[in-house]
Amino acid sequence: MKKSFTYRDGSFYLNDKPYTVISGAIHYFRTLPECWEDRLTKLKACGFNTVETYTCWNLHERREGQFDFSGILDIERFIETAERLDLNVIIRPGPYICAEWDFGGLPSWLLKYPHMALRCDDPLYLEKVKPYYRELLSRLRPHLCTNGGGILMVQVENEYGSYGDDTAYLQKVVDIYRENGIDCTLFTSDGTARWMLSGGTLPDVLAVANFGSYVDQLLTLKEFQKDRPLMCGEFWCGWFDHWYEEGRGQRSPEDMAGELNRFFDLNASFNIYMFHGGTNFAFWNGANHTGEQYQPTVTSYDYAAFLTEAGDTTPLYETAKRVIEERTGVKAPDVAVKNSTKKAYGKVKLTESAPLFGNLASLSAPVRAAFPKTMEELDQDFGYVLYRTELKGPFEELELFCGDIHDRAIFYVNGKQVGIKERSRRNDPIRIGLGFGETAALDILVENMGRVNYGIKLMDRKGILGGVRLGQRFHYGWEMYPLTMDSLDGLTYGEASQSGTVPAFLRGTLTIEGTPCDTYMKLDGFTKGFVTVNGFNIGRYFNPAGPQKTLYVPAPLLREGENEIVVFESDGYEEAVVKLVDTAILHG
């Protein structure tokens, strides 16, 4: 049966009855599908009536023209789960989403088009948006409230007023929605500064505001839309972490109670960002670069949210449940809510090793060019690039320069590590000299640590930008190995040593008796890299940088019996052992 969701005289109406949107953010792409029902059930049990999620173009269309809506990307299954639990849905399809997500959810292949302007009324950009929207919106359309589904609202772009003022572009996004049958309520969301709202709103589209404190900021919306409902599109209950930072604090339940009560005082709707944060699996995290410092986001997206990264309830959850019951007069559904069992499986020895340099053929085919290419020129979105060349003498000791490294490079001469250079950080010089008749193999392993997801430095190409010089002389003649690390099945392993200084994959087996439980992985003897569990990339670790010291291993990734753990260590390790513990360490 079709539903009616409208607004008038400062209020929302669902089927002609006054309605307050009490929403929480849960991103389907940050939580395993096996966990969606648990997280959504807890949202319902807390008294919420709506779930909000972004959609991530860069995973749904990793390769131009090739679409994927399976597994963790099965947005229809996520929506259907919410509908079955009688939750309404808010969808924020971008195309740009920010979200502390690589490139703000835009696919990296857009950067192959040098003359394309992003996030504006650029014909080429919109030409690339339309096929994605056709695929995505065809899946959303049956779930619109106007077709009897749960989707009440769909967002136009995302915080656009913080970036630009091309309202013609915003209208084009609206037009694409309407052409694809999206006939439900549309909205924009922006910060509360007037310059943000003036750049990011449209006269005929509902505007909502995003912030993390002082609810009365919402009243600024009245200057732009006097008779429309007040709504906070993102109320930030916590925050995210960057590598090299100490990490954010926890919001007090008392403070949260006061803010929630003020929303109800103003008859305002709200969306808690995040209700459940989840995880930046694989290489999907984004980065900030608003000043001079490049700041990549960590793997955990716990966000100090109402539910932890593992989906456990927190004091903020209990506070929200109490306030919502008191202010709505509706008792939260009597639904059994249970936190997952955590288990400390102990130490796992990684007994096998596959050196990166000896396994390149199984991971990638080389691309040859005179000048170093960027990841995007190599048709690569995530992972690493190995740049390989031969140096020939004679030349006196010269400093090795790279134009720009995005984002972290490890240098090897004849297989021996000679230095590391990292974007926006103070780096020691690397010097090389060769005599008559001497040659040297130079390898540069560059990691993409996450594309910028917010602000004016969004055009964040990866790899070596601007070439490599010895002193003042450019060096030409390169082999490049794009290393997406999508599949590690072809690696050839030998016996692992107890320590190592070259990049390598280390493999071991975790044996589980009985039903698997959630656990957390500590990698105390390791420096930097990523981990796969039974072939699934659970994300990056970076021990010297912190603050995150454990990686979340969700129970659905594990099985009774033998489980394969593969650690890729880029810098070098001191002990080939990982430890599975029962407590997360996010600020170690």
Short names for language-model regions:
Residues 17, 54-59, 63-66, 71, ...:
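Aromatic- and acidic-residue-enriched carbohydrate-binding clefts of CAZyme catalytic domains
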Residues 28-45, 64-81, 398-400, 404, ...:
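Aromatic- and glycine-enriched glycan-recognition loops and surfaces
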Residues 1-50, 80, 526:
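N-terminal carbohydrate-binding accessory modules
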Residues 2, 91, 95-128, 134-272:
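Substrate-binding/catalytic cleft of secreted carbohydrate-active enzymes
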Residues 19, 418-419, 538-539:
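Short hydrophobic beta-strand segments in globular cytosolic domains
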Residues 125-155, 166-170, 174, 183, ...:
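Carbohydrate-binding surfaces of carbohydrate-active enzymes
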Residues 36-102, 174-179:
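Aromatic-lined substrate-binding rim segments of carbohydrate-active enzymes
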Residues 396-412, 442, 510-534, 541, ...:
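Aromatic-lined ligand-binding clefts that engage carbohydrates, nucleic acids, or primary amines
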